[in-house]
């Protein structure tokens, strides 16, 4: 693009699309409890999985991963350089983490980062997804899987999509920052697992 205005518009559009939290909208549509008010209070895939099960969690993952794709498709159609595509992708992640609405209470940006990587560095996205799935299965803890995938992403990018390594590193840094509290809880042994929470039944009279 020759003018900075369309680039600014794409970044703004990315932030606004990122601000649409999949967990909130999916749970509202299905009549489920708002994940910001239960469990870990994080509006993301893992908390929805613990609270409401596989189907709402899968829908949340799909929405959060897909919301970056339209604006990045436009950026690629306009032949923006990789750093500019990265800026647009980052705006989606910032929107998800610090949304315009929902009182600024966003998610950890893992699913959204997966969607951004699918558009910018597709092989890296799949390597990180595989890493996440294996570690989530072994550790039963989403934070462990997410932290490992975030640390792996720049290395995988250097190997598979070297031109995107810098922007992928920025994405990873944001995900790590968003997991600061999880890192503390892991150190204290208090990080919740991925197992669905059991509903407490009222005592029988």
Curated annotation (Swiss-Prot):
It comes from Chromohalobacter salexigens (strain ATCC BAA-138 / DSM 3043 / CIP 106854 / NCIMB 13768 / 1H11). GO terms for molecular function: acyl-phosphate glycerol-3-phosphate acyltransferase activity. Belongs to the PlsY family. It comes from the Bacteria. The keyword Flavoprotein does not apply. Catalyzes the transfer of an acyl group from acyl-phosphate (acyl-PO(4)) to glycerol-3-phosphate (G3P) to form lysophosphatidic acid (LPA). This enzyme utilizes acyl-phosphate as fatty acyl donor, but not acyl-CoA or acyl-ACP. Keywords: Cell inner membrane, Cell membrane, Lipid biosynthesis, Lipid metabolism, Membrane, Phospholipid biosynthesis, Phospholipid metabolism, Transferase, Transmembrane, Transmembrane helix. Pathway: Lipid metabolism; phospholipid metabolism. Probably interacts with PlsX. It is a multi-pass membrane protein. It is found in: Cell inner membrane. PANTHER family: GLYCEROL-3-PHOSPHATE ACYLTRANSFERASE-RELATED, INNER MEMBRANE PROTEIN YGIH. This is Glycerol-3-phosphate acyltransferase. InterPro entries: G3P_acylTferase_PlsY. The keyword Acetylation does not apply.
């Amino acid at each position: 693009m020759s003018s900075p205005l369309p680039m600014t518009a794409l970044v703004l559009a990315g932030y606004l699309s990122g601000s649409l939290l999949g967990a909130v909208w999916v749970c509202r549509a299905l009549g489920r409890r708002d994940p910001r008010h239960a469990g870990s209070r994080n509006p993301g895939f893992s908390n929805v999985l613990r609270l409401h099960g596989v189907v709402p969690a899968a829908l949340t993952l799909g929405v959060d991963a897909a919301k970056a794709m339209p604006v990045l498709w436009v950026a690629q159609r306009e032949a923006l350089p990789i750093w500019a595509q990265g800026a647009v992708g980052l705006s989606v992640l910032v929107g998800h983490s610090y949304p315009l609405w929902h009182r600024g209470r966003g998610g950890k940006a893992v699913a959204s980062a997966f969607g951004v990587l699918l558009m910018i560095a597709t092989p890296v996205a799949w390597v990180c997804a595989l890493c996440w799935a294996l570690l989530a299965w072994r550790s039963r803890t989403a934070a462990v899987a997410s932290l490992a995938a975030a640390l792996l992403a720049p290395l995988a990018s250097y190997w598979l999509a070297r031109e995107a390594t810098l922007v992928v590193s920025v994405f990873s840094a944001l995900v790590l920052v968003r997991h600061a509290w999880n890192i503390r809880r892991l150190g204290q042994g208090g990080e919740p697992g991925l197992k669905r929470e059991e509903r407490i039944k009222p005592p029988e009279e």
